[in-house]
């Protein structure tokens, strides 16, 4: 690796497995020091042991403000500051709108939206003290377009996209950038029950976690120094449009002349 994140300290939520663990490993590989949190303590401790002195694991329920404060304090105490936040933690639940329980609605809002808000709020002070920062909110393509039966997930991911923009405007003068990443289907434990062909993608496959992590590293680095308030889509072409695969088999000479 090329050391693109040397001198930076990052905090990652939901970092014990899946995309979060991939983000942690990718940033450490590029020279960052990383504090990461989750509620999956055994898995988190195993990742921290693998990364040795470059990482610290903390228990972090993203709905609890005090645990965010403790995670930030760990980063500042252990590594001397905080420059990057990756709001990665999230959950998915599904159901028809008429049967969608209020408790499930509230739960997904608490984790996917309030958790992001609390994370951003917690890191502003140390990032202002550092004179710079990059906040990376993991949204989804469901933050760009709706999906049947994913009402809570879609609502929260759209909201994260909006929160990204309002905070980017507010924090920009302090040198803090805020962007959102919008993955499509990614091969993680949270989505292992989803058929890989559920979305018709231009590339014809689901993403590997590292393909999202590569974008996280870019946004954490100074390479993205003029990017803020923006959406970065990594979805294999899912939201680009309908993939009319049948058209590709039609001979050009046999196509009708369409007049509009």
Swiss-Prot record:
pH-activity relationship: Optimum pH is 6.0 for reductase activity.
EC top class, as a word: oxidoreductase
Keyword Magnesium: no
Enzyme Commission number, as recorded: 1.1.1.53
UniProt keyword annotations, A-Z: Lipid metabolism, NAD, Oxidoreductase, Steroid metabolism
Subunit structure as annotated in this protein's UniProt entry: Homotetramer. Homodimer.
Gene from which this protein is expressed: fabG3
SUPFAM superfamilies: NAD(P)-binding Rossmann-fold domains (SSF51735)
Pfam families referenced in this protein's UniProt entry, alphabetically: adh_short_C2
Summary of the function given for this chain in its UniProt record: Probably involved in steroid metabolism. Catalyzes the oxidation of androsterone (3alpha-hydroxy-5alpha-androstan-17-one) and 20beta-hydroxyprogesterone (4-pregnen-20beta-ol-3-one), and the reduction of progesterone (4-pregnen-3,20-dione). Shows a preference for NADH. Has no detectable activity for oxidation of L-3-hydroxybutyric acid and only an insignificant activity for reduction of acetoacetyl-CoA.
One GO cellular component term noted in the UniProt record for this chain: plasma membrane
Family according to the record: Belongs to the short-chain dehydrogenases/reductases (SDR) family.
Gene3D superfamilies per record: NAD(P)-binding Rossmann-like Domain (3.40.50.720)
The name this protein goes by in its record: 3-alpha-(or 20-beta)-hydroxysteroid dehydrogenase
PANTHER family found in the cross-reference section: 3-OXOACYL-(ACYL-CARRIER-PROTEIN) REDUCTASE (AFU_ORTHOLOGUE AFUA_6G11210), NAD(P)-BINDING ROSSMANN-FOLD SUPERFAMILY PROTEIN
Variant or mutagenesis effect after changing residue 69 to K: Maximal improvement in solubility
Record-annotated active site: 153
Lineage top rank: taxon: Bacteria
Organism the protein comes from: Mycobacterium tuberculosis (strain ATCC 25618 / H37Rv)
PROSITE patterns xrefs: ADH_SHORT
Residues where NAD(+) binds: 17, 19, 38, 61-62, 88, 153, 157, 186, 188, 191
Outcome reported for the amino acid change (mutating residue 6 to T): Maximal improvement in solubility
Reactions catalysed according to its record: androstan-3alpha,17beta-diol + NAD(+) = 17beta-hydroxyandrostanone + NADH + H(+); androsterone + NAD(+) = 5alpha-androstan-3,17-dione + NADH + H(+); (20R)-20-hydroxypregn-4-en-3-one + NAD(+) = progesterone + NADH + H(+)
Pathway: Lipid metabolism; steroid degradation
GO biological process: steroid catabolic process; steroid metabolic process
GO molecular function: androstan-3-alpha,17-beta-diol dehydrogenase (NAD+) activity; androsterone dehydrogenase [NAD(P)+] activity; oxidoreductase activity, acting on the CH-OH group of donors, NAD or NADP as acceptor
